[in-house]
A protein has these predicted regions:
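Active-site neighborhood of HAD-like aspartate-dependent phosphohydrolases
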Residues: 1-43
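Hydrophobic "anchor" residues on beta-strands that sit immediately upstream
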Residues: 4, 107, 132
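An amphipathic alpha-helix signature
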Residues: 21, 25, 42, 46-54, ...
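Short helix-capping segments at alpha-helix termini
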Residues: 30-34, 59-65, 102, 125-129
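Alpha-helical substrate-recognition element adjacent to the catalytic core
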Residues: 30-60, 90
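Metal-dependent phosphoesterase signature
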Residues: 55-94, 104
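Substrate-recognition "cap/lid" segment bordering the active-site pocket of phosphatases
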Residues: 84-87, 113-141
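Substrate-recognition element of Asp-dependent hydrolases with the DxDx(T/V) motif
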Residues: 92-122, 136
Length: 141
């Protein structure tokens, strides 16, 4: 019998809300909009970058072109700062080590873009033999 546990990344393995909020606030600032306190971000996240950016914008300012421009600012900032405040939830590194030591494969499936998923997994869980690390890829639904 094969054994595998698949984890989401943000909000499951990693508490990344402060870095996501900082990147979204950077994008808002670059586009001339007011920012939000980090404490507001849990209600904005959960469905990928595009939805996050849509949710942080004032309703009257939401349009595909603006969201795409903000997405570029978000990725620029987040690419350099994705691990400034992010950290594993308590007990997660030990849990992953226990699972793999018992022969249970572990994987990550995230709606975060692929490069960021790989970076964060390798940065925070360097000794874990991941069966798969999958994030959002251009052209793949």
């Amino acid at each position: 019998m094969k054994k595998l546990v698949i984890f989401d990344l943000d909000g499951t393995l990693l508490n990344s809300i402060a870095d996501l909020g900082a990147a979204a606030n950077y994008a808002l600032t670059q586009c001339g909009f007011p920012t939000h306190p980090v404490s507001a971000y849990p209600k904005f996240v959960g469905s990928g970058i595009t939805k996050l950016l849509e949710r942080v914008l004032p309703e009257s300012a939401r349009n595909p072109e603006r969201i795409e421009m903000m997405r570029e600012y978000f990725k620029e900032y987040y690419g350099k700062h994705m691990s400034d405040y992010t950290e594993p939830y308590p007990g997660i590194p030990e849990l992953l080590e226990q699972l793999t030591s018992r022969g249970i494969a572990v994987a990550v499936a995230s709606n975060k873009y692929q490069d960021a998923v790989e970076h964060l997994v390798n940065h925070f869980f360097p000794g874990i033999p991941w069966a798969a690390v999958e994030g959002q890829k251009e052209g793949v639904p």
